[in-house]
């Protein structure tokens, strides 16, 4: 099966997951592109406060991811967890234009990143569960491609909307609510939980299992850690 044929015959739910990622990334990146200006110019935050907000937000997302995969396997309710994660993120979007203090922005970012941490593992597991083994590469590639499209559309929309709204940043931030709601709607209506997950197997989280991980795993983890430490904040 060639790449074109494989992509055309991917399950409808995989396309729905991809569109969910596209819409949510459009919403998130629209906000993130304007957030430093909003914090420092509109709310009068310092560079230190901006760094604190972003540091707490990203740390929250990474820590939450550690447990979301285990929870997804244990409960076998991947769609429910994904909806919870995307739903929480969508619920935070109105908080940004409503914010009149740095504390409210921090709360919004904190909850938004919890949502991101919750949804990542069950969403990717859903892609694998919904797709035949020979199509999984194409399925993951499609979802990530649509995610990247959303990450591009968000900042582009911010530029256009700031121009059209005469630099009224609060009005522009309200527009981010629309794609966030679309993301949750597509996920709820377009994805069904695979039937075989109903007969799930419990997957206890045990520290002793770490000893079973081979050197190749730790090499990848080590490389990822180094690159992450070297990454600059996008704020």
Model-inferred region functions:
Residues 177-197:
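C-terminal membrane-cytosol helix-exit motif in multi-pass small-molecule transporters
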Residues 80-95, 177:
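Structural signature of the two symmetry-related core transmembrane helices
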Residues 1-12, 193-223:
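Juxtamembrane intracellular "pre-TM" segments in multi-pass secondary transporters
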Residues 37-42, 153-173:
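Transmembrane alpha-helix termini and helix-breaking/packing motifs in multi-pass membrane transporters
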Residues 58-66, 151-152:
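Residue-level signature of mid-helix packing/kink "hotspots" within the transmembrane helices
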Residues 5-61, 216-235:
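Helix-loop boundary and gating motifs at the non-cytosolic
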Residues 64-77, 162:
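Helix-to-loop junctions at the C-terminal end of transmembrane segments
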Residues 108-149:
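Cytoplasmic helix-loop-helix junction between adjacent transmembrane helices
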